[in-house]
C-alpha cells in the first residue's frame, strides 16, 4: 500500500476461455484444475491471475494519463501438482499475495519493478528471513525477466546457486554451465562396436571400459509434447529439463517410457546412442569438443567406441546440462556453491506478453494505440510461514519473530486457584488489550511446567509468568528467543 498499490479481489472460478486467449491454458496443461458447469461450459480454478488483472486494466486505463498504477489481491490459488509434498511448501491449494503493475513503456516498468523489489525486501526483512534473490526461469508466466526470493532452508526443494567470490545468485534451473573443456586435438579413429553384456548404467559401462564417466556421452530419450527426442551430454552430467524445455519451446517434457525407448532404439533401456537414431538429437555444447567417445549402440548389450561428431546428425547444440557444485561462476570464475531454498516470493517483468494477446492498449500523447507494459509480483503466504518455522525453531518448538507471531506475549498464571494471581493476570491482560497488544492469557488449571512447555512449543515471543511474587508486585518475563528471565 505504501508503494501505491490498490487492493482488489478477483474470482477463483474463471472461464477457461480467459486462459485460452492468452495461450496459457496449453502452457499450464494438466497442472490446471478444470471443471464444467451445469450448462457444460468449461471453467478452471485460477492458478494465477495475470489475465483477469489485464482485463480489469482494459476497463480502467485508456489514456497515458491513467498510468502508472498497481493492483494487488490476497487470494487462494489452485494448481494440480503432480506430487504435492513438503507440508505447506508444495500444495494444490494455497494463499498468495499477487500484485500487477501497469506502465506505458519499459522505463516505467523498470521503475515499478524497482518499487516492488524494495517493498519485497522490506517485507522479508521484517519477517527476519535469511534469503537470497536469484535469477529464475520465467516458466509459464513468460516475459522478460524473473527473480525469486529464496529463503535458505535445509528442507527447501529448490537448489540456490551462489559463488565463493562474488554476489552471483541463480536458481539451478537457469544457471549457465561454463564450458571449461579444452577441445580434443587427437586424431579421429574409426568407430568400433563392442559387446558389453550385463552393463547399462554409465558407472557400469565406465567400469567395463576402465574409463571415467566423463569419457562417455550418454543419450537420454524424452517425449516433448508427444514427440520423441534425444539429448546427448557428457556421461558425468545431468540434463537440465528447464533448459531443454526452453530450447524446444515445449509445453510438457517428460522421460520417455521404456516401451518408447525400445521402439526408437531397438534395444533395452541403457543402450541408446545418437548413431543412426531416427529422431531429433539435441547436443550439449561440451560434447562438441570431444573426440573418440563411447556411446550406446542402439543394440542391447552393445556400445560403440571412437564415435565423433561426423558420425551422427545434430538438430541443435546448446547448454543443456545442470550446473554442479564447484563449477566455474559465470560472473567471476570462482567455484559455485549450493544451498537449498524455499521460494517465498517472485518478481516478473512481463513486458507486453499479456497486452499483446489480450489487446490491452492505451492512447499515447500522439493519440496512437500502444501496448501496456506489465509486471507481476507474488508472495506465498503459507510458504513464508514454513520458511520462518524452519529457520526459527529449537528442540522445544517454534520461535516466531514478533512481526508474525500469533500473540505478542503470553500471560501464564502459575496457580489458577490463587485469586491474587488470577486478579493480577486479568488486570494485566485488560491493560494490554486496551493498548492494542494481542496477548494470550493462559489461565488453565494445569501444572506450570505444562503451560511453560506449551508456550515454548507455540513460539510466543514473550512469556509473562505470574506466581508467588505477585504479592510483592513482581512478575517474571522470559524472551523466547533467548530464554533469559527478568
Residue ranges and their predicted role:
Residues 1-81, 214, 222-223, 286-290, ...:
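Active-site loop/lid in soluble adenylation, ligation, and acyl-transfer enzymes
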Residues 10, 133-135, 255, 440-444:
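A structural preference for short, hydrophobic beta-strand core positions in alpha/beta folds
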Residues 13-16, 260-263, 443-450:
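Short acidic loop-to-helix transition motifs that present clustered carboxylates
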Residues 50-58, 83-99, 104-377, 381:
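Extended, low-hydrophobicity, polar/charged segments
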Residues 205, 375-404, 486:
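C-terminal, non-catalytic macromolecule-binding modules
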Residues 397-451:
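Generic long, charged, amphipathic alpha-helical segments
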Residues 428-486:
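C-terminal structured "cap/appendage" subdomains that terminate the fold
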Amino acid at each position: 500500500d505504501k508503494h501505491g498499490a490498490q487492493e482488489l479481489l478477483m474470482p477463483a472460478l474463471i472461464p477457461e476461455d480467459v486462459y485460452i486467449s492468452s495461450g496459457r491454458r496449453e502452457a499450464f496443461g494438466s497442472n490446471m484444475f478444470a471443471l464444467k458447469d451445469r450448462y457444460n461450459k468449461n471453467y478452471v480454478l485460477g492458478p494465477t491471475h495475470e489475465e483477469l488483472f489485464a482485463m480489469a486494466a482494459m476497463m480502467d486505463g485508456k489514456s497515458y494519463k491513467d498510468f502508472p498504477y498497481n493492483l494487488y489481491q490476497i487470494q487462494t490459488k489452485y494448481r494440480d501438482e503432480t506430487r504435492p509434498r513438503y507440508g505447506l511448501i508444495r500444495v494444490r491449494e494455497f494463499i498468495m499475495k499477487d500484485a500487477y503493475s501497469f506502465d506505458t513503456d519499459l522505463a516505467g516498468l523498470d521503475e515499478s519493478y524497482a518499487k516492488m523489489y524494495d517493498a519485497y525486501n522490506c517485507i522479508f526483512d521484517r519477517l527476519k528471513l535469511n534469503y537470497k534473490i536469484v535469477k529464475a526461469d520465467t516458466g509459464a508466466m513468460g516475459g522478460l525477466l524473473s527473480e525469486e526470493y529464496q529463503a535458505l532452508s535445509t528442507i527447501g526443494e529448490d537448489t540456490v546457486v551462489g559463488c565463493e567470490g562474488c554476489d552471483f545468485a541463480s536458481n539451478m534451473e537457469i544457471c549457465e554451465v561454463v564450458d571449461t573443456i579444452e577441445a580434443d586435438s587427437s586424431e579421429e579413429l574409426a568407430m568400433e562396436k563392442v559387446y558389453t553384456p550385463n552393463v547399462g548404467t554409465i558407472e557400469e559401462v565406465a567400469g567395463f571400459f576402465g574409463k571415467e564417466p566423463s569419457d562417455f556421452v550418454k543419450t537420454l530419450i524424452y517425449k516433448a509434447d508427444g514427440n520423441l527426442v534425444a539429448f546427448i551430454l557428457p556421461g558425468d552430467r545431468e540434463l537440465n529439463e528447464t533448459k531443454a524445455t526452453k530450447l524446444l519451446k515445449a509445453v510438457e517434457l517428460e522421460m520417455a517410457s521404456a516401451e518408447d525407448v525400445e521402439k526408437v532404439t531397438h534395444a533395452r533401456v541403457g543402450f541408446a546412442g545418437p548413431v543412426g537414431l531416427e529422431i531429433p538429437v539435441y547436443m550439449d555444447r561440451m560434447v562438441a569438443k570431444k573426440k573418440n567417445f563411447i556411446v550406446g549402440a542402439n543394440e542391447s548389450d552393445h556400445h560403440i567406441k571412437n564415435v565423433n561428431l561426423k558420425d551422427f546428425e545434430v538438430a541443435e547444440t546448446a547448454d543443456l546440462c545442470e550446473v554442479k557444485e564447484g563449477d566455474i561462476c559465470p560472473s567471476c570464475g570462482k567455484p559455485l556453491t549450493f544451498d537449498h531454498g524455499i521460494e517465498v516470493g517472485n518478481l516478473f517483468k512481463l513486458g507486453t506478453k499479456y497486452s499483446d494477446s489480450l489487446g490491452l492498449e492505451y492512447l499515447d500523447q500522439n493519440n496512437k494505440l500502444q501496448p501496456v507494459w506489465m509486471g507481476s509480483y507474488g508472495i506465498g503466504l503459507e510458504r513464508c510461514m514454513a520458511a520462518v518455522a524452519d529457520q526459527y525453531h529449537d528442540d522445544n518448538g517454534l520461535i516466531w519473530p514478533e512481526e508474525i507471531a500469533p500473540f505478542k506475549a503470553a500471560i501464564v498464571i502459575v496457580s489458577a486457584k490463587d485469586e491474587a494471581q488470577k486478579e493480577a493476570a486479568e488486570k494485566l491482560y485488560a491493560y494490554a488489550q486496551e493498548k492494542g497488544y494481542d496477548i494470550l492469557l493462559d489461565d488453565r488449571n494445569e501444572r506450570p511446567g505444562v503451560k511453560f512447555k506449551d508456550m515454548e512449543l507455540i513460539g510466543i515471543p514473550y512469556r509473562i509468568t505470574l506466581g508467588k511474587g505477585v504479592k510483592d508486585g513482581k512478575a517474571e518475563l522470559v524472551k523466547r528467543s533467548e530464554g533469559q528471565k527478568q
